[in-house]
Amino acid sequence: MVETFESYRTYLFAIAYRMLGSAMDAEDMVQETYLRYQTTPKDSITSLKAFLTTIITRLCMDQLHFMVNPEKLARV
């Protein structure tokens, strides 16, 4: 399971870095994607690359939303 995720780590980091512009934030998103991957039943994933791409993209979009609207983060 870890080896499979690790084969996509560079790809996921590149997506997150392009979206966020920060290596530290990109690494955080990769780690969060891994946690989501860990807690998802593997038999429900039909395409690992598509699943991981969707997760990291949505996480980055959420991060960008909070960067633009920090007052919403305070309410969470």
Task: List the predicted regions and their residue ranges.
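A short, charge-rich alpha-helical start-of-domain segment used by transcription regulators
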Residues: 1-12, 24-27, 43
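Residue-level preference for hydrophobic side chains embedded in well-ordered alpha helices
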Residues: 4, 8, 12, 33, ...
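Hydrophobic recognition helices of helix-based DNA-binding modules
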Residues: 12, 37, 60-64
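Sigma70-family region 2
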Residues: 31-47, 67
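Arg/Lys-rich amphipathic alpha helix in sigma70-family domain 2
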Residues: 54-74
